[in-house]
Amino acid sequence: MVEAIVSFGVEKLWDRLTQEYEQFQGVEDRIAELKSNLNLLKSFLKDAEAKKNTSQMVRHCVEEIKEIVYDTENMIETFILKEAARKRSGIIRRITKLTCIKVHRWEFASDIGGISKRISKVIQDMHSFGVQQMISDGSQSSHLLQEREREMRQTFSRGYESDFVGLEVNVKKLVGYLVEEDDIQIVSVTGMGGLGKTTLARQVFNHEDVKHQFDRLAWVCVSQEFTRKNVWQMILQNLTSRETKDEILQMEEAELHDELFQLLETSKSLIVFDDIWKEEDWGLINPIFPPKKGWKVLITSRTETIAMHGNRRYVNFKPECLTILESWILFQRIAMPRVDESEFKVDKEMEMMGKQMIKYCGGLPLAVKVLGGLLAAKYTFHDWKRLSENIGCHIVGRTDFSDGNNSSVYHVLSLSFEELPSYLKHCFLYLAHFPEDHNIKVEKLSYCWAAEGILEPRHYHGQTIRDVGESYIEELVRRNMVIAERDVTTLRFEACHLHDMMREVCLLKAKEENFVQIASILPPTANSQYPGTSRRFVSQNPTTLHVSRDINNPKLQSLLIVWENRRKSWKLLGSSFIRLELLRVLDLYKAKFEGRNLPSGIGKLIHLRYLNLDLARVSRLPSSLGNLRLLIYLDINVCTKSLFVPNCLMGMHELRYLRLPFNTSKEIKLGLCNLVNLETLENFSTENSSLEDLRGMVSLRTLTIGLFKHISKETLFASILGMRHLENLSIRTPDGSSKFKRIMEDGIVLDAIHLKQLNLRLYMPKLPDEQHFPSHLTSISLDGCCLVEDPLPILEKLLELKEVRLDFRAFCGKRMVSSDGGFPQLHRLYIWGLAEWEEWIVEEGSMPRLHTLTIWNCQKLKQLPDGLRFIYSIKDLDMDKKWKEILSEGGEEYYKVQHIPSVKFEKDYK
């Protein structure tokens, strides 16, 4: 609902006015009036959100409030920034500008007055058109829809599922938990909407083994808005005789509790709670359960941790989506009429098209059923082809805002969206920026959220922007709205994506809320522009973008280019940006600039917080870049041999992420000592900056250092000594340079107690002993070290290591040995470009958890170790093409890898 999103914006604006109140000397009365009006808006939005009204008039009022909030926020921030700029100017200049200051404040007061008038008009319109009554009416209809849905779920608890496909194994497993596992009392079935959780629970509920095991059975659908008393009444009615129904309805809550507690204590009962939404809902219900073990509970929910806290006798079961084959079987039952009992009537061409369409369902049973229903009454190839052309919208089934189809994919999945807190609604809608199947990087996403004010200050508590953003992703994953897995080495969510059906809902919601304007194809003519009033604009895979011609919204706050072609760049034209002074996010990944220069007009974007020029084709940055004092994210790792960077970064005190160019002229000097809030600093070079500048950066989590002139190890380690939060350290030197070989003789700084990832690209013929490495190291990468001795006997004693990379000439010897008991946690091993390596011995008992093994471009290695046969955990093996003949089925070494599910031969370095 847009009300929740706008309400979030009003709250942020209110907080800003409160925090910056001392800045508004001379206009205090106007600010007080504005805060009073904001209070009125907050009350209205709170009411509209709580009652979930969907009328067009209410939406119109809310949209107008949203525009007012955006404009007010921009106006206030512009005033504060200009005031700060004046304070930084010299005394003489200040004296000469006193008159200008008075004029500026008068203009600001006038602007506030204009905003207040707009608020008053919205409030007047709400009274004139009876908006408050519409909200109340909408609340009643929303409640009726919820009640109807609850009744449907309750009615079908004992129904037979004619379209039950692919769940037999799951039913057996769940029945086992309930019937055979005495130590398990609570079983939850969790997953995204439409996955078939309720269908699965029905099969378990009606299973003969379950009926035989339990004396009493109860099925209770828990609506989103329920009372504890009502739920307890339904449980008692289910568990007792029908004659007591009226008596139960007369009971008070305390009496219900006592009756249920005693009943569950003295009988073997199973209670199914279908569709619990919140952990606190379960907390309200569960006081009726006694400590004794006779009872069991089966829960269905979209939230994975619904009954987890404080309960050791709990197991969560997460069904997987249907396979393509299972989806096809389910689809046939619904879409294709039978010729006889064993055969479906279907044209071969239609079958091929049907199989293509079900792929779009992503294995979601509800989506497959909806698709089957849509095609059941369509009998020609032409009908099927026409539907396939816009399959996403057809399956999701979104109509207008008053859509009452409770079984549509849109309705089922959008319930999860409506249940989100306001800030997470923003986060979810932001994912509409990205194309289908795009791997969304969580770190960059977190900084975009922070730049737009979506990350709430109350969630920081000393955490980094990345930490807070990741906690939001974790919450969306827990609610089964986003798909992401933690990286085994970092234990972080590195990337995420959406299920195809959830993405369709995300796009539709974003369109409803006018959240972002998505451009996949540029306007066909030079005179056409992208219409629309959204404050966010994303262009997906453009070949050319002419900013001043193609974008006509001066209130734009976010401009993102999502570019997925790794080999080519796209052209950026008309890039003065002067008309887009309110931008907060600007992502120009792989842009090719006119004249290879970043325009000086970039300095006018004083609101900018996020600027990404990663792999852009630009040779020179303007000194006006220093005006961007609100930047928290700056990536200038451009795709040119040498980038001119003016010494203008010192004033960017808010920077949290700075990625410098990999190659910069040694004449360029950059002062960085003021950037004490940095959390990530990449491509720092001793050729362009002083190691002394690092000493104040105590908040760094990630640091990449390039050593290009003689530096003692004492000087280097003294610079990073105070970085007690450092997790990821990379050190590189010029290729083959031996003057830094003593840097690592005694190992890395032991004071770096949180260091988890270490990347060394330097000449280092001897590896330090294992005691000279941080004890919690999970990942190490060695590149160009020219190690003479086998590194594995040392590395395998680092007990927390989960990833090892040996890159080009990391080891120059001939023989490596992996010992029994070595690398107990290792998950991934990458070996590339070891030109002299001939033999690898793997003892039985080595690397017991290895999942991925990659060996490329090791020309002298003639055979894989026999010990690979004993590593049963390996799932992926990736080799050069030259190995294909001997490792494929029938090959002389196939017996060593036949237990590995995925063996690939992708590269050839001959």
Swiss-Prot record:
Query: What's the superkingdom here?
Result: Eukaryota
Residues that coordinate or bind ATP: G191, M192, G193, G194, L195, G196, K197, T198
Q: Which residues form the NB-ARC domain?
A: 148-460
One Pfam family it belongs to: Rx_N
Metal-binding as a keyword? no
**Where does this protein have coiled-coil stretches?**
15-57
Read off the InterPro entries from this record. Apaf_helical (IPR042197), Disease_R_plants (IPR044974), LRR_dom_sf (IPR032675), LRR_R13L4/SHOC2-like (IPR055414), NB-ARC (IPR002182), P-loop_NTPase (IPR027417), RX-like_CC (IPR038005), Rx_N (IPR041118)
What are the protein's UniProt keywords? ATP-binding, Coiled coil, Leucine-rich repeat, Nucleotide-binding, Plant defense, Repeat
> Its GO biological process terms?
defense response; response to other organism
Q: Name one GO molecular function term.
A: ATP binding
LRR repeats span 580-604, 605-628
Q: What is known of its domains?
A: The LRR repeats probably act as specificity determinant of pathogen recognition.
**Function comment:** Potential disease resistance protein.
Q: Which family does this protein fall into?
A: Belongs to the disease resistance NB-LRR family.
This protein's name: Putative disease resistance protein At1g58400
Organism lineage reads as:
Eukaryota, Viridiplantae, Streptophyta, Embryophyta, Tracheophyta
